[in-house]
Amino acid sequence: MDDPSATLLPEHSEDLRLARDAELKKVLKLKLVLDELRRLDVGPNPSDEIKRALKLVSIGSYARLGEMEGAGQEQVLGLPSGSSFPPLNYTDRKTVRTKLSAQLRTTLQPIAELCDRIREEFPDAFGQEADLSCDQKEILRLEEEHRSGLEKLVALLTRKCTLLKETAELKLGPQLANELKLQQAQAQLVQTKAELLRGFFVHEAASRTEHSVKAHKEVEAHLDELLAAKK
């Protein structure tokens, strides 16, 4: 059976490809924005964090939006075909960076300003306990216990390391002094043995040499007597 896709006209296939590429560009741009939004840490001072995000979007790796840098490139939203989007030219990349920066600034700055204003006007609003269910309260309680247990464990491990260090210093201090004295005593003992052996060998060599000369003379005299008797 013939492939139904083979009946499509070439211009129709080109239009479909261009439409697919355009949609993939939109998906990729949205994914980049969402990834950067997820990295935001809206803490006590979110303005600095938002400025950091805007800076990353402006001069970060998004400048190469659409470029292929290897087979291990992340797929767009898990779509295998998401990595086949066409590369963007310089104008497109600049437009994307400008629009991303403008959209982030327009969307996030009012949120940050509102958050700062709420914190100033209602400083105790965020400290009040939320209306949580029993299960949620239990989860929070267990999380607090877990965090408290970890803090206690860290404190105990730190205390243990300190005690081990102090014990090692107390133990090794006198021990090293005693070992040094022992090494000195052993060295003196070896030196004394060497001196005794040297004196013994000198004495033995001198005494044995004297006896050897005397015995040699006696044997020589005895041989002379035997030779004279044979004549």
Swiss-Prot record:
Major localisation: cytoplasm
UniProt tissue specificity: In adult females, detected only in the abdomen with no expression in the head or thorax (at protein level).
Any coiled-coil regions, as ranges: 128-199
Keyword terms: Cell cycle, Cell division, Coiled coil, Cytoplasm, Cytoskeleton, Microtubule, Mitosis
GO molecular function terms listed in the Swiss-Prot or TrEMBL record: microtubule binding
SS bond list: none
Compartment(s) of residence: Cytoplasm, Cytoskeleton, Spindle; Cytoplasm, Cytoskeleton, Spindle pole
GO cellular component: cytoplasm; HAUS complex; meiotic spindle; microtubule; protein-containing complex; spindle; spindle pole
Example of a GO biological process term: cell division
Miscellaneous remark of the record: The name 'dim gamma-tubulin 2' derives from the decreased gamma-tubulin staining of the spindle pole seen following RNAi-mediated knockdown of dgt2 in S2 cells.
Function according to Swiss-Prot or TrEMBL: As part of the augmin complex, plays a role in centrosome-independent generation of spindle microtubules. The complex is required for mitotic spindle assembly through its involvement in localizing gamma-tubulin to spindle microtubules. dgt2 binds to microtubules in vitro.
Subunit structure: Component of the augmin complex composed of dgt2, dgt3, dgt4, dgt5, dgt6, msd1, msd5 and wac. The complex interacts directly or indirectly with microtubules and is required for centrosome-independent generation of spindle microtubules. dgt2 interacts directly with wac (via coiled coil).
Protein name from the UniProt record: Augmin complex subunit dgt2
Species of origin: Drosophila melanogaster (Fruit fly)
Record lineage: Eukaryota, Metazoa, Ecdysozoa, Arthropoda, Hexapoda
Gene that produces this protein: dgt2
